[in-house]
Amino acid sequence: MANRTIIAFDFGTKSIGVAIGQEVTGTARALTAFKAQDGTPDWQQVEKLLKEWQPNLVVVGLPLNMDGTEQPLTARARRFANRLHGRFGVQVALQDERLSTVEARANLFDRGGYRALDKGSVDAASAVIILESWFDEQAG
């Protein structure tokens, strides 16, 4: 297994959560959440993050319905992933993110109650779950 640095994004129309992880350990941690205007982040913030961490791969959560079908947000997340690749030349993978927000909220609540459930924390924690599920899939 390679020792690649990987950044994950939990795409949303108002906020985009970010996590970072190492493939060799299969672990991830929350980094931040960016505000977004109708799904568009401040691309300068994204560029700064990518320059700082220099990931070998970017994983973008793909929002699907529970039955696995696509929803309107699915196409927007794909577009966001394509823009990351087009603007910054990074390799991008998509990862099913069903229930990541539910799991993130439960984990944060367990650690800090309602006060821990601010939008940025939830989105960054969701990005961690997306990245960890990607690691799990790669491990087989």
From Swiss-Prot:
The keyword Hydrolase applies. GO terms for cellular component: cytoplasm. GO terms for biological process: rRNA 5'-end processing. GO terms for molecular function: nuclease activity. Keywords: Cytoplasm, Hydrolase, Nuclease, Ribosome biogenesis. The keyword Endoplasmic reticulum does not apply. It is found in: Cytoplasm. Its EC number is 3.1.-.-. It holds the Pfam family RuvX. Coiled coil: none annotated. Its main location: cytoplasm. NCBIfam families: RNAse_H_YqgF. Could be a nuclease involved in processing of the 5'-end of pre-16S rRNA. Belongs to the YqgF nuclease family. This is Putative pre-16S rRNA nuclease. It comes from Yersinia pestis.
